[in-house]
Amino acid sequence: MDFVDLKSAEEFSPQHHVHKSLLTTSHSDISIACWEPGQTSPIHRHPGADEIYHVISGSGLFNDGRTERRLVAGDTVIFPAGEVHQVTALTRMVLYRVQAGADRHPESLDAWPASR
């Protein structure tokens, strides 16, 4: 059994959000992502992996190109494999992230696809 203390894994940067992988298997990855207000991810997708975010603290906007939702501590969202998405922190925010799938690498896009 592996164990991680999430609170001790928190780390923030004024330049960009900090993402730390905590536990990894061949088909999954558990990580923590720490965001300062206003920090945003590129528009991207993970073609081979589902991505689940659980908001530990703070709040942010989660966008799939069709819907933008404000999530707060205690909320959870899932982006199925291949779904384009973007995350923006409204306040200092800590996310618990689980990726499930063999190919978890992100594919960045310059803009939202026309066929949203």
PLM feature spans:
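Conserved short histidine dyad/triad with adjacent acidic residue
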Residues: 31-46
